[in-house]
Amino acid sequence: MDYYHTRKVRILNGAHTSSVLAAFLAGSNYVQDIVCSEKVGSGFNTPNADAQKFMHDIIFNEIVPSIDGDQEDLKKYAQDVWTRLQNPFNPHRLIEISLNSVAKYWTRCLPSVLQSIKKNGSVPKLLGFSIAALIAFYNGTEIKENAKGQKCLISKREEGEYENLDTLPVLEFFAALNKETKDAKVIANKVLSNVDFWKEDLTKVAGLEAAVAGHLADIQSKGMKKALAEIVK
């Protein structure tokens, strides 16, 4: 992957995948709910300041510094991305962006996590939280066929149920795991050690399992809105 493709995948695509699941679980429905601080457009926007700070800081404080290359160029590109995301006339639904999130996370976000750990010797706080949010997003126990004939995991957030769309093996893995246990440590271990997801055993990455399990426990006990508000302080 060349520099410019890496820049796009890690910053533009990675910004979406690392941020939208936490924002969705906290009640947001559109990208503009995250990036716009005031109501804009035709009424779809419900501003979430915590989700906005989470997405902004994960881009500029964790993703950009993790990428090898000219940091000034990367920051400029990131600012262009941030400006583009704020376009109120091009709304993107978070539930649609969430399609196949496990594979997307592996491609777009995991390299930033691992590079950050390699460079700094510690798990990046917000990216670590984003893995926990990914796991929390797949919280259902029942797979059903939706109105379009697609298999989906019926998951829940405070606002109600939603259809989680992914490949059947991913849905079956989470449905079985959630039936088996609610223990954040066990769930984090099972997900991170799934080589089919990550092409490696992420429990072997120093500090990652403990960090993700801790964030997941916070999400479970406090709810995403409070956990997100606390992580961005």
Residue ranges and their predicted role:
Residues 1-233:
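Non-transmembrane, aqueous-exposed alpha-helical and coiled segments at domain scale
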